[in-house]
């Protein structure tokens, strides 16, 4: 990494900049190149105050642009980072840029969020309108607002803090000297990066404090370098005249919704769910998260609204780094209807999740916008509650089933199409309302597939259950297994039962007693869970009621597990017998577990089938094939 800092006098700013780099750049190896444009102050003795600098001192004053070009020739790093001397960097500023550019080969240049010393925002990426005018998006606003904190494509990034590969820099030929001595060279570079086939992307995690105007002044009508801004803006418009025709139009009071992220040609999806998906804690969150990733991958601009309007870590930042804009905070909570009204012509699809959330938004969207509503129920709540009523005889569950039926059918009637994770729900709905448009979709979507799964089941040990205990069917499953099935198994084989999941109840915790063979681990990290999947011989999913495709079952298949489940657990899963054993009732379930546990070869056979199976039924390609027509905009932008 080569950090190029162009300087002309202002030694106190340069020194403060260097000090901030030293303090806040611990996770990237770098060199610093000082591009000294014949300074007359103490800058020329900078080597007396700082060590290990590469100092490139011009013989004559070259101006900002040529000074940068000349110094960059000395860069030895894979990447070149141009950083103004009137900046101070913050923790993670450089690693976040490097991580982003290395995460995607289509990205050619990345840049930082620029903040004024008083804490106000200077720029969250730049907009160039078709008339040649420009905006520092978000200028003087609160830099912590959601709209300034997601990764996005931008027209340009101010050259105060930009990074690109040394190879691409050389391929382009550096800053175009047409714009010497300064101004618009950064905008021009962004257009050159796109011309070379790459994207220009804003990284909000890279926060740089910028004392704007220290080097070049702020008066465009004066005698300083700032006066070149007006002249060079004309040159930029002339050079890129054809590209400017594709830019958004400045109407005098334009809505920057699409211009700020270069999504003029992209369909926009608003995804609504109960909260930011906690993808490592529950299956419902995982499916929402996987669909968000798929929408981004397929080229959509994705907005996410969690009904609790909370910013929850690390989940929110994970989505924002994927390129998803999240609507959170008191301002959005109070003004969500105004936001929808203001941007109704920019949003193509509203993807509403879960009945208790979707019902809050569907009527407003249908009445006040032309946004296409697609509803995903996750499972049929009324069917799940009715099955619990059948199992327990609890009349309250019958009333809850009737309540959910009215809500769910109301949503299906209002939505353009309603999704459920299997043909079972589709058939149940059409038995009552054959006129509703229902689609059975792929419930869980995987981009990557596991390699090198350890298939030596003979050295694996124990039975594993995974599931969040905020979901009542999971708690019922573990209690039933522990009390009625596990004792039958332990009579025949010496084995432990590991219970994993978030929000463990006291009743579940109480199952772990000395000599019981039951170990309640509770919530574990994704890494710990992967380890448990790879070391447990059998995954058990003893569900007695529920509805829809069960995420815990699909996840176990993805992880190459040997699985024993019930008819409810395998419900809606195509060709389930390829990758799992199904048994109902305590004796039959116990028999199947013991039989599988004592047959490592059969466990291995099942494991070897899993990745092929996941590719067929739960890949991005399989999922998108089912829903693509529903997410095709009526009009091209």
Feature map (PLM): residue ranges:
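Acidic donor-binding segment of Leloir-type glycosyltransferases
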Residues: 22-60
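Conserved donor NDP-sugar-binding/catalytic core segment of glycosyltransferases
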Residues: 87-129
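Acidic donor-binding loop of glycosyltransferase active sites
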Residues: 346-348, 416, 534-548, 561
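A short, conserved alpha-helix in the catalytic core of glycosyltransferases
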Residues: 92-98, 149, 153-173, 178-209
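Glycine-rich, basic loop-to-helix element that forms the pyrophosphate-binding segment
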Residues: 58-75, 91
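Short aromatic/hydrophobic "clamp" motif used to bind/position activated sugar donors
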Residues: 80
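Short, flexible, basic/aromatic active-site loop/helix in glycosyltransferases
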Residues: 112, 117, 129-155, 170
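Conserved catalytic-core segment of nucleotide-activated headgroup transferases in glycan assembly
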Residues: 280, 284-289, 293, 304, ...
């Amino acid at each position: 990494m080569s950090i190029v800092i162009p300087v002309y006098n202002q030694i106190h700013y340069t020194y403060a900049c260097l000090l901030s780099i030293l303090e806040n750049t611990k996770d990237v190896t770098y060199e610093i190149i000082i591009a000294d444009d014949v300074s007359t102050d103490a800058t020329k003795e900078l080597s007396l105050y700082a060590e290990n600098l590469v100092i490139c001192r011009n013989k004559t004053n070259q101006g900002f642009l040529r000074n940068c070009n000349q110094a960059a020739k000395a860069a030895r790093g894979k990447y070149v980072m141009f950083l103004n001397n009137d900046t101070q960097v913050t923790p993670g500023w450089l690693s976040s840029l490097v991580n982003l550019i290395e995460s995607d080969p289509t990205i050619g240049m990345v840049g930082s969020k620029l903040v004024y010393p008083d804490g106000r925002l200077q720029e969250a990426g730049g907009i160039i309108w078709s008339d040649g005018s420009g905006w520092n998006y978000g200028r003087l606003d609160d830099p912590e607002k959601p709209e300034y904190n997601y990764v996005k494509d931008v027209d340009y990034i101010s050259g105060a803090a930009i990074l690109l590969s040394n190879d691409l820099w050389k391929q382009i030929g550096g800053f175009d000297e047409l714009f010497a001595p300064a101004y618009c060279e950064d905008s021009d570079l962004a257009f050159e990066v796109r011309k070379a086939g790459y994207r220009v992307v804003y990284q909000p995690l890279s926060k740089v404090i910028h004392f704007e105007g220290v080097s070049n002044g702020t008066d465009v009508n004066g005698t300083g370098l700032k006066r070149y801004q007006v002249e060079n803006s004309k040159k930029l418009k002339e050079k890129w005249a054809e590209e400017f025709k594709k830019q958004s139009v400045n109407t005098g009071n334009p809505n920057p919704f699409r211009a700020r992220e270069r999504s003029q040609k992209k369909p926009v999806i608003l995804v609504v769910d109960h909260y930011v998906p906690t993808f490592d804690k529950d299956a419902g969150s995982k499916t929402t998260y996987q669909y968000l990733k798929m929408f981004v991958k397929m080229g959509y601009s994705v907005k996410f609204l969690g009904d609790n309007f909370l910013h929850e870590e690390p989940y929110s930042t994970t989505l924002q780094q994927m390129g998803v804009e999240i609507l959170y905070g008191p301002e959005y909570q109070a003004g969500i209807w105004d936001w929808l009204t203001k941007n109704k012509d920019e949003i193509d699809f509203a993807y509403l999740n879960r009945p208790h959330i979707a019902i809050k938004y569907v009527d407003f969207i249908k009445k006040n916008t032309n946004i296409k509503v697609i509803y995903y129920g996750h499972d049929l709540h009324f069917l799940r509650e009715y099955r619990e009523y059948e199992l327990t005889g609890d009349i309250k569950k019958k009333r809850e089933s009737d309540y959910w039926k009215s809500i769910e059918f109301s949503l299906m009637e209002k939505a353009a199409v309603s999704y459920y994770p299997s043909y079972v729900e589709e058939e149940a709905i059409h038995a009552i309302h054959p006129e509703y448009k229902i689609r059975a979709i792929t419930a869980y979507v995987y981009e990557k597939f596991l390699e090198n799964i350890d298939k030596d089941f003979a050295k694996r040990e124990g039975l594993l259950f995974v599931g969040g205990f905020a979901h009542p069917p999971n708690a019922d499953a573990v209690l039933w297994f522990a009390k009625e099935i596990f004792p039958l198994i332990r009579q025949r084989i010496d084995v432990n039962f590991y219970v994993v999941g978030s929000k463990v109840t006291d009743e579940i915790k109480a199952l772990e007693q000395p000599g019981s063979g039951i170990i309640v681990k509770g919530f574990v990290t994704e890494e710990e869970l992967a380890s448990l999947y790879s070391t447990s011989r059998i995954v058990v999913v003893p569900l007695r009621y529920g509805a829809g495709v069960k995420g815990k079952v699909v996840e176990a298949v993805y992880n190459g597990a040997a699985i024993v489940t019930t008819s409810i657990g395998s419900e809606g899963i195509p060709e389930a017998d390829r990758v799992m054993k199904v048994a109902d009732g305590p004796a039959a379930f116990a028999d199947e577990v013991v039989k599988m546990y004592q047959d490592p070869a059969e466990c291995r056979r099942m494991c070897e089938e899993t990745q092929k199976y996941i590719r067929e039924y739960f890949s991005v390609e399989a999922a998108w094939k089912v829903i693509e027509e529903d997410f095709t905009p009526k009009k091209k932008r």
